[in-house]
């Protein structure tokens, strides 16, 4: 049947993953669990998490783009006044989505215009506004490296590079799996396909005498 054509079962896969940095500031540290729940319910994956106490010098480096502004001394003093929680987040349109969840910079304005956002719920003013988020893709990359200096941030395939990656490494295996799915017609196709992909991952290491060994190149 035409509907059984595996190539027509789903649209062409695309890569949308984006990363951003979220900071839970000292004034909202007691709300960490609640904020993390909101993050996860919003479709984010928490790639890394770290609780730390920043020094005034570290705060100055992190907020270097604010240097020379009137609020800069107050910002660095506040951010070094207590522990913060740094979170490396990932999902499609992560930067824009996290900014929307945070709401306006001013918690006072946020309570008037976006009463359900994090800054309206957990912040008190422009300075003590509960959370921070990366403004741009380049800022996210820099801030994640700042908070997680030992992490390796692989470049995300985009545009033609993403299409090439999918056509070379993903689509061939996926097409075989979908073909088998159409033949077998399991009761739970999603679970069946997930298990099939796990068992037929071409990059899965071979196991020999209890030890995992990679195939020779």
Curated annotation (Swiss-Prot):
Phenotype on disruption: Morpholino knockdown of the gene in embryos results in ciliopathic phenotypes, including a ventrally curved trunk, small eyes, otolith defects, hydrocephalus, and reversed heart looping. In the spine of mutant animals, the cilia of the central canal form normally and there are no changes in the length or number of cilia, indicating that the gene is not required for ciliary development. However, the beating movement of motile cilia is rarely observed in mutant animals.
Record keyword Hydrolase present: yes
Highest taxon above the source species: Eukaryota
Biological process according to GO: cilium movement; CTP biosynthetic process; GTP biosynthetic process; negative regulation of oxidative stress-induced intrinsic apoptotic signaling pathway; UTP biosynthetic process
Catalytic class of the enzyme: hydrolase
Residue segments, region NDK: 18-151
PROSITE patterns in the cross-refs: NDPK_LIKE (PS51374)
Compartment(s): Cell projection, Cilium
SUPFAM superfamilies xrefs: Nucleoside diphosphate kinase, NDK
Molecular function via GO: 3'-5' exonuclease activity; nucleoside diphosphate kinase activity
Keyword Aminoacyl-tRNA synthetase carried by entry: no
Alphabetized UniProt keyword annotations: Cell projection, Developmental protein, Hydrolase
GO cellular component: cilium
CDD domains reported in the protein's UniProt record: DD_NDKH5-like, NDPk5
Entry-linked PANTHER family: NUCLEOSIDE DIPHOSPHATE KINASE, NUCLEOSIDE DIPHOSPHATE KINASE HOMOLOG 5
Role, per record: Functions as part of axonemal radial spoke complexes that play an important part in the motility of sperm and cilia. Does not seem to have nucleoside diphosphate kinase (NDPK) activity. Exhibits a 3'-5' exonuclease activity with a preference for single-stranded DNA, suggesting roles in DNA proofreading and repair.
Family: Belongs to the NDK family.
Domain notes: Does not possess all residues considered to be crucial for the NDPK activity.
The protein's name: Nucleoside diphosphate kinase homolog 5
UniProt organism field: Danio rerio
């Amino acid at each position: 049947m035409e509907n059984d054509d595996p190539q027509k079962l789903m649209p062409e896969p695309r890569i949308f993953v984006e990363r951003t940095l979220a900071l839970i500031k000292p004034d909202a540290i007691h709300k960490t669990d609640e904020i993390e729940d909101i993050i996860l319910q919003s479709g984010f994956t928490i790639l890394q998490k770290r609780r730390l106490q920043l020094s005034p010098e570290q705060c100055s480096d992190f907020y270097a783009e604010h240097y020379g502004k009137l609020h800069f001394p107050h910002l660095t003093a506040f951010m070094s006044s207590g522990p913060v929680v740094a979170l490396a987040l990932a999902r499609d349109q992560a930067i824009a989505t996290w900014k929307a969840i945070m709401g306006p910079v001013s918690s006072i304005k946020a309570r008037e215009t976006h009463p359900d956002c994090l800054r309206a719920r957990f912040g008190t003013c422009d300075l003590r506004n509960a959370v921070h988020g990366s403004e741009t893709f380049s800022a996210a990359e820099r801030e994640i490296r700042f908070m997680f200096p030992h992490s390796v941030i692989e470049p995300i395939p985009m545009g033609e590079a993403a299409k090439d990656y999918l056509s070379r490494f993903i689509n061939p295996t996926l097409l075989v799996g979908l073909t088998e799915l159409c033949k077998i017609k399991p009761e739970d196709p999603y679970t069946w396909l997930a298990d099939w992909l796990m068992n037929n991952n071409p990059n899965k290491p071979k196991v020999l005498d209890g030890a995992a060994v990679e195939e020779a190149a």
